[in-house]
C-alpha cells in the first residue's frame, strides 16, 4: 500500500501535463490540464489527487531528472519543493553550508538575495502556486454534480468528500508556507477565472484563509490513523493548526499560544502517531514502518524517483569515500555538497560529535542525534580554508549523516541505491511535543511541569534512557533536564538538535528573534563568522518575474 498513491500519480502524469511559464499564479486553463479522459473513471480522480501530493516531492512526468519537468525553464534537479525548501529554511541559518554559486545558493547562504538574483526563491514560489493550481483543479471537478454527470458517482460517493478535504488541506498548507516565506501574496482558488488577475492579500488575510480552511475541513478528513499511507488525516490538520498558531505572532502580529498548545496536545494525546522507539529509524529507507510520521512525502527508488527529495538529503550530504566508512545506501554516488556549520556541531557535546568507524550508528554516543562525519582524511570542523576563505573542499566542515538509504538492519533496500527510498517526514509527532512545550513557556495555560515533561520525553528518546533503553545501546546517561534549565533559549537549541535538516530552522529562528540579528553563524552576510543583516530578510521578495506579469502586486518592504 505504501507506494500506491504515488504510482497513480506517475500513471496520470502523462495526461496531466503541467508545465508552467511566467504567469505562475494564474489559474490553469482547462485545455492545459483537464481532459474528459482524466475524469471518466474513479482512478482518474485518484490520480489527480495523487498529483497534488506528489507535486511536493516529485518534479516531472518521467521520474528522476528524465525531462518534461513541472516548471518550465527550471532546472529539474534543483527545482523540487523539498530541495528548494532546504535552501530557504536551512542554508540561510546556523545549520548547513553549500559552497555552490549557482541558482542563487550563495545569496541564500549569505542572506544577500533580492527579487532577481536567486532562482531557488523564484522556483519555491512557483512550486507552491503550482500545487495550489492542482488542488483548485480537483476542487472544481470533484463535485457531486460532475461525478453524477460523468457516471462515476457510485464509485466515488464514499470518497469524494475526503478527496475534497485533502485537496483543501494541501492548499492550506501551501498558503501557510507562502505566508511564512513571502508574507503578502496573490490569492487564487477554484473559483478564480482563467482571465482573472489574482489579487494580493495581506499576510494576515492569507493566514486567516488557511486557518479557516483547516477548521472547516477537520471533520471531513479521515479519522486519525484511518487513511492510507501518504495521505493526511485529522491529526495532520491539528498539527498544522498548532504550527500556525505558534507562529501567529510573527505572521499576523497577534499571538495565540493557547491554541498552539491545545492543538499540539491533541496530536500528542490522540496516540495514533506515537514517538518512534529509536530516533535514527525516522530517516531510513524503511521509515514507512515508523509510527511517528504524521504526514510522509513518499519517495521510492523505483516508483517515485527524484533528485530533489530525500535523494538530495543523502547524496548532497555525503561523498563517495564516505561509503567506505559506513553504509550510506548510495554507494559512490555522493555529491559532496552539504556540510554542517560550526554552530550546529557546537549544539552537541564534543564527545558525541566524533564519528567512530567501529560504531557507525553511534550506539555508544550519549545523544544519538549527533550524527556527524568527522573521519575523512584531513577533515576539520571549520567551514573555511587555511586562508580563512570560503572553500568548496568537502572536508572543511563536518558531514551530517542522519539520512541513510538503508533499512534498520543496515541493508540496502530492494529498490537499490540509484535513488533513495526514504520518505520525507514533513510532519512528525516530536514537533508537537516541542510546540506544546514552547507554547507553555510563551504563556499558554498549562503547568511548566508539563512543558518539562514534554521536553524530557523528546530528550530521553535519543539518549535511549529509561523506557527507551535497548540492549547493546548506551543508555547510562539520561537525557532529562531539570526545571531550572528549561527556558526559551534551551528550546531553540533543542529544536536545532531534534530537527536539523527538516526544513523548519529559519522559521524557528525568526520566531525566537534570532534570525537577522542577535545571533550569528558561518558566512552570514558573507562574513566568515557572520554579522547582522537587514530585517528585510525576515521575508523573501516576491519574484521579479511575478511583478512583471502582475503589476498590481506590491513588493515586500526593502526590496
Task: Please describe what each predicted stretch is.
Residues 20-22:
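Bacterial signal peptide processing site
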Residues 179-180, 186, 247-253, 442-445:
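Short coil/turn linking the two alpha-helices of tandem helical-hairpin repeats
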Residues 62-95, 188-191, 221-239, 246-323, ...:
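Short, surface-exposed recognition loops and adjoining beta-strand edges that mediate ligand/DNA contacts
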Residues 37-44, 49, 53-62, 76-85, ...:
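Elongated scaffold/linker segments in the mid-to-C-terminal portions of large proteins
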Residues 41-42, 46-50, 54-60, 92-181, ...:
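Conserved, well-structured interaction surfaces
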Residues 16-18:
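C-terminal motif of bacterial Sec signal peptides marking the signal peptidase cleavage site
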